[in-house]
Structures are given as structure tokens and as C-alpha cells.
């Protein structure tokens, strides 16, 4: 669930009233002249788009030009004042460097998971990957020198040489990347974004791929769904697709191992699992300890690893990380170690959370190479991720994970086919307004999008179902998760703050940017040229979700694809433990084996993930709602051992 952040307005003492004229003058300074250096583009394009021709303002009172964001539909910014970001405003940037020998890397990634190949399941160590495919030390040194020359400090280089992070300010970014940055209010909080592309000197053109950290207007949001009775408007009438004796009820996290036939496998005590998070994990670990004590499970060996330098602040909302950790442990029966790879968020309002800090966290999980399976219950519109460069940057991280035999599992999203559309307070899946009697749609219902990083070909994308059981632990049926329409923007008590409405449904569909991997085209047909998601799906409905501990309070019923991915991670950790942590990214095997071995699956054939006859409709076999469906983990494990 995306929640509104209540941002504290704090001003540094250096912006005291006496210094205000100087600060204003600094923000209006022109971009440095480019004559001395030949500048070339990176993948990081302008995130803030002007809808008016560039023209010098003749008076201070001249109206501001209209702006839009560089995401699907280029949503216009309304009722907000767009001004230059003060040049002294601190920024944390991450420069993403290009891999070397990319053709060889792509060939290796194909072969390492291809039975019969000489490289089959012969994974690389981080040192081996660095030697063969990472940027050279000389290339890194050139980037570091450029950052230093433009005033950046606290420069750090990732262990795999692919990320160079640094602290500076908007003025340093303007000098170093020719990047103009604006500030404005969006989704109820003050944010910033670049309104020009990030450029680099031509001498770095073959080295640098993108520059992250130039915007914090669009970052991945949490994908959990908590019950709010006042929010319901048009709930879908869901067919149980099961026997008359079945029911749709909430579950303890330990129930899912039985429901999906993982409980017969040994607990995943030979496997280390990671979770991508942000901020402080103190409350999350306390809640996890309460859960394991109540469930009769062993206390979990946990660790918190910061994705980069900076503050891991408590933002007061541990629900997402509680859902992830408790359902992974409940489904897995226990793990060797649970590592929280936490992105720097800066403060209690998450104002320091950017595309840069999240990519840093993904990369830290890969360079550590300790976690076999890594959960990501986060997502955002993939057009936004492509615009700022993080889509390609994250793909590069996930490629190294595949080469090392690590598995990233990513939630497919909770906004159905409308990941791109957001409410006034930033909730995805926005479709229109409610006047008390009927819904008035205000978007193009035929425009679809998918969530990043779930759309990456180098991860397992996990969609959502509505689960029916006999009792609470015997699988009886699943349909596509689609709860219909609800109020989008809620206060802390779960009451609507405006008349905006959204859908709650599993993400799924066709990527606009990611090419279909060969194994997907081979299984689904030559017409599939772009990556389609999800690959598999598990329980996500709030009504059939998990009872977890949040802020010390037990029996909090939560759903979303943030539940579905941890169920897969917990079950897959058992499969990995039973197979010596040797299976690697399983998607190519899924697409090779599942079409002809349906006994390994629970096929989902009913429901859709849109609104008012839009979206994708489930069918026999693979579909854009639930992929191949949910797994019978014991049968998949036995098949994997052959």
C-alpha cells in the first residue's frame, strides 16, 4: 500500500532570512557553458517535462509554464508551483557504469541455466564476475576524477565497480551533469526532479550508463494491502472456483507451506534469504521475534546491511517489512540467515529515498553474494524507471545475480493494468472519482502498463490470486486477485480524504521496454517479443491474506502481491535447501517444463486484472494475470532434482 508521507518542513540554518537574497540569486544562475567540453547523453532523461516553449521570463510575476512527468501518459502537474532547486540543496547521486563484454555476458546468462550447456549451473563468484564483465579500475578512476573535479565528496565505489556514489548538491549536479533540477509538490509532499537530461563529458561516454539520484518524485512504493472497511466501494464478486466446502479466510503465515505443499520439504535452514527494504529495521525485527515466538518457530538469525552511506531512519510504518519477513519465515519454516538489505531513506519522511539508494541496496545484496533468494515487494511504473535510468541500472544488477546463482523475486504490483495511473495522493491504480452513488472514470481504461522491477527478464515476477481453502491449510482453488474499486487516498484511520478511487488487483501484462527472453518466446510463441509478466502467482487478496504482527499488534490481516512474493520466496528457499542452493534463476526451467507438466501447478483460469471489461482475462495455461499459476513446491522440488 502506498501511504501518504507527512513531511516535516525543515530549513537549514544556512537558509536563514538574512541569506535569502544570495540563495535566490544562486538558484537563478545559468547552466555552465558547454563550450569547453563535448557533452554526450546518458540513459537518464529529463524527468520533469515542460509543456511550454522555453522563453525568458520578462517579469517575476510571469506565469510558470505547465509541467508533466516523464512516465506513462505524461501526467501533468496541477496546482503546484515549480521553481529551481537551490544550488546548495544536498544530493546523493549514483553514477552507473556499463558492463564490459556484454555479448559474452548475455551468452553466459543463457548457458548457465541451460541443461546440457558446459556452463550449466557453474555460477561465478563476485570476483570472477568482476574480472570478466565489470568496469575496469581505470574506468572507475575516470568517473571518480570527474566527480571530484565538480565538487562531489564522500565518493564510494561498489565492490563490483559498477556504481560510484557521491554526496554533493544541486550545483555540483549542474556542473557535473549539466542537469537543471526543479522543486515542486507532488503526491502531497515536496519533491525534486531534473528537467533536463543528465550529460557527461564525451571522454566518459563509453563508461557511464546513467546518473541516479536526480529525482525523488517517483520511487518504488510498497505493495501491501491492509483492510480498510470505509474504503470499499465496488467489491468484485469473486467466484471461488472450488468445492462448496471451501472458504476464503485469512491465514497464519505458517499455513502457506501446507497450502502450497512445501511443508513436506525440510525447512530452509541451509539457505540465506535477503529482503530489500528501506530505513530502520528495529521494529520489524522485534515484530518478527514476536511472530516466531507465537508460532513456535526458532528465533531468526537476522542482519541489517545498509545499501549505502547515510541514515536508516524509522518512518513509523514497518508493515511491508513485517509482511515480507514473517511470511518468508512462516512459509520456509526457518532460514540460515535473514538479511535486510536496507536502502538509505534519510529521515522519518523518507525524503532521502531515491532511485539511487534503492539501486545501491539491490547491488549490495549481489556483491555480498550471501543470500540465495532475495525478496522485493516494491514497484513503480516502468516508464518512470526507464526515464530516470534505473530500469537499465537494476537490470545490470540482476544480471550479476543470475550469473552468481541468486534469485530475485519481485511483486508484480497491486494496481492491475493501471500501474501508471496515480491518485492525487500518489496511490497507483487510480481510475476516477466516486460521487456517492457511482464511479466516474477519468482515465483511458485501455491504456495499460506493468511494474518495474518485476518486468525485468532477470527476476521472477510474482502475481496475485484470491485463495480458497478447505479449512485453513488445504488448497481448494484460486482466481485472479481483483478486489474491485475502493477509495484511493485514506487517512491514518482508513477513512477517505477525497473522492479518488482505485482498483486493487494483481499486476500483469506486457513490458514497453524489456525484450522477451528467449525462453519466454519459445514457450509462448513468436508473437511474444516483449517481456510479459507475471511468471507465477500466489495468494494476495486481503480477505484471504496473512495474519501478521505490526508494531507489536498481532492478527493484522494483510494482502497484496507483497504477500505473494514472500510466499514464493519462502517456498523456493525450501526447494533451494533441498537442492544444495544450486538451482539459480528458475524462470527458464519454468517455461520449458510447465507447459507439458501441469501437475506441478495450480492453473488459474478465472478472473481478470482490469476494470469494466478491461484488462487481461485468465485462461488455461500461461496468462497475463497469474502466469502459470501457483506451484506445488514438493513436486517442483522433485522435478528440479532430476
Say what each PLM segment does.
Residues 1-36:
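Gram-negative bacterial Sec-dependent N-terminal signal peptides
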Residues 458, 463-494, 500-501, 505-507, ...:
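Active-site-proximal C-terminal subdomain of hydrolase catalytic domains
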Residues 466, 470, 521-523, 569, ...:
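An often Trp-containing, charged/polar helix-loop segment at the C-terminal end
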Residues 38-159, 165, 170-461, 492-496, ...:
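Substrate-binding/charge-relay-adjacent region of secreted/lumenal peptidase catalytic domains
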Residues 28, 422, 472, 569, ...:
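N-terminal low-complexity, intrinsically disordered patches enriched in charged
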Residues 12, 509-510, 570:
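Glycine-centered structural positions embedded in regular secondary structure
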Residues 16-17, 155-156, 400, 613-614:
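Short hydrophobic/aromatic segments of transmembrane alpha-helices and their interfaces
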